[in-house]
Amino acid sequence: AVMTVKYTNTWSSYSTEKQAAKELVDEDCVVISQHSDTVGPAAICENAQRDIPVYHVGYNQSMTDIAPTRSLVSCCVDYSSYFEQSVYALLHDKKIEECIDGRTYKQDAMAGIDKGWVRILDINEAIVPKGTKEMVEDTIEKIEKGKLEVFSGPFTGVSVFDRNDKINLNTPYKENANSS
């Protein structure tokens, strides 16, 4: 499988996101996962007129109402834990990084599904194969118990910005490990 990336350089431009999704459909993409906030890509997937369906993975809101026959799953970032822990730090005159229940790298903080910072919003059981929900729940449990790294596996690639920048996830990638 090949992953193609299109950058919109915005979180919330319906027309730009639709255009990027349409380009992916025209390039014979079979699954579009978005990391922007409008329903544009889901609408493009739902309305794509071709023999092979174009499925969709949503971000920050359920897309099932927009793409009932194409939206597989949606997830969201849940900042509530970060905000609660940050406010606690401020009220107790502590550094935020000392109070975060997650990984911190200098001034960057992050956590995933294991800490509740990322959540699955819905799985469209009307279109996914039987047993998908249970498989997702099992995968989440493995992540929560530290038995599965999200950014790891037999995947390699090349950066779209620098062809000399090779990506190899046979060794797990720690996001933002070298930031700040």
For the regions a protein language model found, what residue spans apply to each?
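A residue-level marker of the well-folded mature domains of exported/periplasmic proteins
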Residues: 1-180
